[in-house]
C-alpha cells in the first residue's frame, strides 16, 4: 500500500504529448455537443500525466472564422455610433467591452439567422471577416473584446465540468504560419492547382479506399480548416517538439484529420514515426435514438444540462436524509457531475450512447453515483474504526485472504497498474471505468460478507481496515484520473 503509483509501471522515457480537445467556438455557449470532447480529453490528459508524461492540453478555439464577421456586423446594426465603426476615429479603443456575455450570446444567433435570409448582410459579414483577418485595427479591437468576454465564460463553464486547459490558443494563433506553410508546400512540389484551388495528394499505396486530395487554399485565396490545423501543428512543433499528438474530436471529422496528418508527415512538418492519434467519438443521443435535444427541439446548453442533473440528484439525496443541510448543494454538484461523466466515459469513446438521466443518477448499477456510494461507505467505516480504536488504529500489512470475497477484492486491486497502462496506450478511458466498477462490486461483496466494525479479532479487523483503505485509495485515484471526485456523505 506504500507504493505511490499503486503498482503502475510509469513511463521509462517520458514523452511530450499534445492533447487537442474542447474545440469550443468563441462567442457561442457550450452545448451538449461539446461534452464528449471535453470529458474524454480531460481524462486522457490525466491518465497520460499519471503515467509520467509531459502533457500539454490545448482547447484550440474556433476564433477566426465567419462568426466574427457576423458578430461585428450585427453589433454595427445595433450600435452604429460605436467608435469602431467611425472611419475618422484615430484615438485609443475602449478597454470596456461594448457588450456583456448574455448580449454576446444573443448577438451571434441573431446574426447567424439574419445571414441565412439577408444576402447583403451576409456579404457585409464576409467583408468584415476579411478585414479582421487582414489586420484592420478597429475590428481587431472588437475581436479582442469578443475573446475576453467569451473566454471568461468558457473557463467558468469548463471549470464546472472539472476540465481545464494549459493553452487557450485558437485558429487565430496559427494564422502567421500559413503563408510559410503554403510556400513550403509549393516549393516541395507537393501542392498543385486543381480547379483554381491549391491541393495536396494524400493517397498512399495499400489504401483500402480512395482518399481525396487535401485542399489547402480555396480558389478565392481563402484558407480552410485544414490549412489552419496544419499551421497549428507547425506552431506546436516549434514551441514543444511533441513526441505524440492526440486529437479528441467527433468521429465525423475523421477524413479531415487523415488528410491533415498525412500532409503534415509528407511535408516533413512532423517526423514520420511520430504517433498522431485521432480519437473520434460517437454522439450522445436522446431516448428516441436521435441527437439529444431540449423539449422545444433545440440544442441544449451544457450549463442547463448540468443544472437539470444537479436538481434531480438534490431531490434524491434529500429523500435519503444522510447529507448535512449545508453540504446538500455541493454534494449534488459532485454526484451530478460524476453521473454525467461516468455515463459518458464508461462507453467506448467511438460508440454512440443514449442519455438517460434517471439511470445515470441511480445509486445502484453501473453508475458514477454507485461507485461514489461505495467510497462514502468506506470513509464512514474508517471514521467509525478510528473512534472505536482511537490511538490503536495502526496500519498493518494486508494478510493472505481467508475468504473468496476477500481474495477477489485483493486480486482486483492488483490490476490497477495494468488497467491504467492499457487505458493510456489504447486511449481508452472506458477501461478505467469498467475496472473501477469491478473494484466497487468486489468491495461491496466483501463488505456484505464481513462485519468489519464488529469483528472481535483485533488483528483480523486491522487487516480488513488496511484492505479497505487501499480499496479507497485505488477508487479515489481512478475517480481523479476520470476527472471526478467523491463527496463526504451521500
Sequence positions of predicted segments:
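Short, basic phosphate-binding NTP loop
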Residues: 1-5
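Non-catalytic interaction-recognition regions
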Residues: 6, 11-490
Amino acid at each position: 500500500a506504500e507504493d505511490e503509483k499503486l503498482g503502475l509501471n510509469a513511463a521509462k522515457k517520458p514523452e511530450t504529448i499534445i492533447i487537442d480537445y474542447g474545440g469550443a467556438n468563441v462567442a457561442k455557449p457550450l452545448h451538449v455537443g461539446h461534452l464528449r470532447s471535453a470529458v474524454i480529453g480531460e481524462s486522457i490528459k490525466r491518465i497520460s500525466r499519471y503515467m509520467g508524461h509531459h502533457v500539454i492540453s490545448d482547447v484550440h478555439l474556433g476564433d477566426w472564422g465567419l462568426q466574427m464577421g457576423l458578430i461585428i456586423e450585427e453589433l454595427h446594426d445595433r450600435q452604429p455610433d460605436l467608435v469602431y465603426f467611425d472611419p475618422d476615429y484615430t484615438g485609443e479603443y475602449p478597454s470596456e467591452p461594448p457588450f456583456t456575455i448574455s448580449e454576446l450570446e444573443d448577438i451571434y444567433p441573431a446574426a447567424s439567422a439574419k445571414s441565412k435570409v439577408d444576402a447583403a448582410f451576409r456579404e457585409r459579414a464576409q467583408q468584415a471577416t476579411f478585414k479582421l483577418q487582414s489586420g484592420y485595427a478597429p475590428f481587431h479591437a472588437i475581436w479582442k473584446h469578443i475573446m475576453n468576454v467569451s473566454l471568461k465564460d468558457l473557463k467558468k463553464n469548463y471549470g464546472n465540468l472539472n476540465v481545464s486547459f494549459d493553452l487557450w490558443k485558437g485558429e487565430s494563433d496559427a494564422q502567421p504560419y500559413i503563408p510559410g506553410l503554403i510556400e513550403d508546400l509549393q516549393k516541395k512540389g507537393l501542392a498543385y492547382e486543381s480547379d483554381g484551388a491549391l491541393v495536396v495528394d494524400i493517397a498512399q499505396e495499400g489504401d483500402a479506399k480512395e482518399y481525396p486530395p487535401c485542399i489547402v487554399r480555396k480558389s478565392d485565396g481563402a484558407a480552410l480548416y485544414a490549412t489552419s490545423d496544419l499551421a497549428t501543428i507547425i506552431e506546436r512543433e516549434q514551441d514543444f517538439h511533441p513526441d505524440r499528438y492526440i486529437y479528441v474530436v467527433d468521429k465525423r471529422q475523421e477524413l479531415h484529420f487523415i488528410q491533415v496528418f498525412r500532409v503534415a508527415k509528407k511535408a516533413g512538418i512532423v517526423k514520420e514515426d511520430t504517433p498522431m492519434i485521432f480519437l473520434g467519438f460517437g454522439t450522445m443521443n436522446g431516448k428516441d435514438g436521435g441527437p439529444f435535444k431540449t423539449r422545444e427541439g433545440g440544442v441544449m446548453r451544457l450549463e442547463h444540462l448540468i443544472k437539470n442533473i444537479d436538481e434531480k440528484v438534490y431531490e434524491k439525496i434529500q429523500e435519503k436524509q444522510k447529507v448535512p443541510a449545508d453540504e446538500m448543494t455541493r454534494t449534488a454538484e459532485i454526484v451530478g457531475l460524476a453521473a454525467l461523466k461516468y455515463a459518458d466515459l464508461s462507453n467506448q469513446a467511438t460508440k454512440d450512447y443514449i442519455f438517460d438521466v434517471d439511470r445515470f443518477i441511480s445509486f445502484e448499477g453501473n453508475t458514477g453515483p454507485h461507485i461514489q456510494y461505495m467510497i462514502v461507505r468506506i470513509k464512514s467505516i474508517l471514521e467509525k474504526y478510528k473512534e472505536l480504536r482511537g490511538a490503536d488504529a495502526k496500519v498493518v500489512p494486508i494478510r493472505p485472504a481467508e475468504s473468496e470475497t476477500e481474495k477477489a477484492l485483493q486480486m482486483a486491486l492488483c490490476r490497477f497498474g495494468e488497467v491504467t497502462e492499457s487505458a493510456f496506450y489504447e486511449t481508452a478511458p472506458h477501461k478505467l471505468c469498467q475496472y473501477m466498477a469491478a473494484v466497487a462490486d468486489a468491495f461491496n461483496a466483501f463488505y456484505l460478507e464481513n462485519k468489519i466494525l464488529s469483528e472481535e479479532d483485533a488483528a483480523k479487523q486491522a487487516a480488513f481496515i488496511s484492505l479497505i483503505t487501499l480499496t479507497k485509495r485505488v477508487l479515489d485515484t481512478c475517480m481523479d484520473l476520470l476527472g471526478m471526485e467523491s463527496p463526504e456523505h451521500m
